[in-house]
From Swiss-Prot:
Disulfide bonds: C21-C84, C43-C64, C53-C76
Subcellular location: Secreted
Keywords: Antimicrobial, Disulfide bond, Fungicide, Plant defense, Secreted, Signal
Family: Belongs to the DEFL family.
The protein's name: Defensin-like protein 316
UniProt keyword Signal, yes or no: yes
GO biological process, one term: defense response to fungus
One CC-aspect GO term: extracellular region
Residues annotated as signal peptide: 1-18
Length: 100
């Protein structure tokens, strides 16, 4: 992977496991996502579908990507939302996810 020096966006969001492909690296995960919509505002009174706002009032909509470089494991064994710390590299399609 090419190195990039660029600003980061830090946020905490709830991920619906049914729509997140995880690749395990110990306590962290590599997630391939495609961000289709980004909204920075107060949380809506009713959550949209399976996604919810966090305390930072950042709402993301995304879907899993496929790539020949990574083998994805879609883990929905516990059917629970995963609360993660997301570090988003603005010019990449991949984010690093650490469970908190």
């Amino acid at each position: 992977m090419a190195s990039h020096i660029i600003c980061y966006i830090f946020c905490i969001i709830k991920l619906s496991c049914a729509h997140v492909c995880l690749m395990s690296f110990g306590s962290s995960y590599r997630v391939g996502v495609h961000i289709t919509h980004e909204k920075v505002a107060a949380c809506p009174r009713q959550n949209q579908r399976l996604y919810s706002c966090d305390s930072l009032r950042i709402l993301y909509h995304y879907s899993c990507l496929t790539t020949r470089d990574l083998l994805y494991i879609c883990d929905c064994s516990d059917f629970e939302n995963i609360i993660c710390l997301i570090r988003l590299l603005l010019n990449l399609d991949f984010v690093e996810v650490k469970l908190v």
